[in-house]
Amino acid sequence: RFKKIRRLGALPGLTSKRPRSGSDLKNPLRSGKRSQYRIRLEEKQKLRFHYGLTERQLLRYVHIARKAKGSTGQVLLQLLEMRLDNILFRLGMASTIPGARQLVNHRHILVNGRIVDIPSYRCKPRDIITTKDKQRSKALIQNFIASAPREELPNHLTIDSFQYKGLVNQIIDSKWIGLKIN
């Protein structure tokens, strides 16, 4: 993971750890002139590694975004941000997106009262995301919420940390996406 971070820059969804030498990110010595192909490839890899997607999944999202009205790049980022694993990460219920994927796969998460075990589930506005009533599920989420530093919550989400409940208010606004993409 650190190799990817050193090569592509900060990827907050991939890991909460940081490489030791802060000035070593994006080493300027080996850079040279970057071709258009290299720039596009690096941006695509940033998306893949940040959101934990395979090549095929990313191509499918690009295909959907191209069919939709509006800017393809903005629609693509909205689609990726409305995934269940990413919303859990944004709510602070998981420290990383892979951690959120594991919570979903292990059936700790309910959406609108139903167990959802698909991390790529596309959340809609007014979806209520809660944990199972099992003690183990609540303990996992409680540990994440307690240990995570309090970051500003995006305005399209609200969280009730005492009831372990999150609410999707609306589709995400582009300024809340923490990833810098060209």
UniProtKB/Swiss-Prot annotation:
- Note the Pfam families from the entry: Ribosomal_S4, S4
InterPro entries in UniProt: Ribosomal_uS4, Ribosomal_uS4_bac-type, Ribosomal_uS4_CS, Ribosomal_uS4_N, S4_RNA-bd, S4_RNA-bd_sf
The keyword tRNA processing is assigned to this record: no
Please indicate if the UniProt record lists Chloroplast as a keyword.
yes
Chain ranges of the S4 RNA-binding domain: 82-143
| Keywords noted in UniProt | Chloroplast, Plastid, Ribonucleoprotein, Ribosomal protein, RNA-binding, rRNA-binding
For this record, an example GO cellular component is: small ribosomal subunit
Q: Name one GO molecular function term.
A: rRNA binding
The family database entries (SMART domains) matched by this protein are listed as: Ribosomal_S4 (SM01390), S4 (SM00363)
Which SUPFAM superfamilies did the record assign?
Alpha-L RNA-binding motif
Using the UniProt annotation, give all residue ranges assigned to the region (Disordered). Answer: 13-32
Gene Ontology biological process terms, A to Z = ribosomal small subunit biogenesis; translation
Where found in the cell? Plastid, Chloroplast
**Where primarily located?**
plastid
Q: Which residues form the signal peptide?
A: none
- Protein role: One of the primary rRNA binding proteins, it binds directly to 16S rRNA where it nucleates assembly of the body of the 30S subunit. With S5 and S12 plays an important role in translational accuracy.
| Subunit (UniProt) | Part of the 30S ribosomal subunit. Contacts protein S5. The interaction surface between S4 and S5 is involved in control of translational fidelity.
Tell me the protein family, please.
Belongs to the universal ribosomal protein uS4 family.
Q: What is this protein called?
A: Small ribosomal subunit protein uS4c
Protein source organism: Scadoxus puniceus (Paintbrush lily)
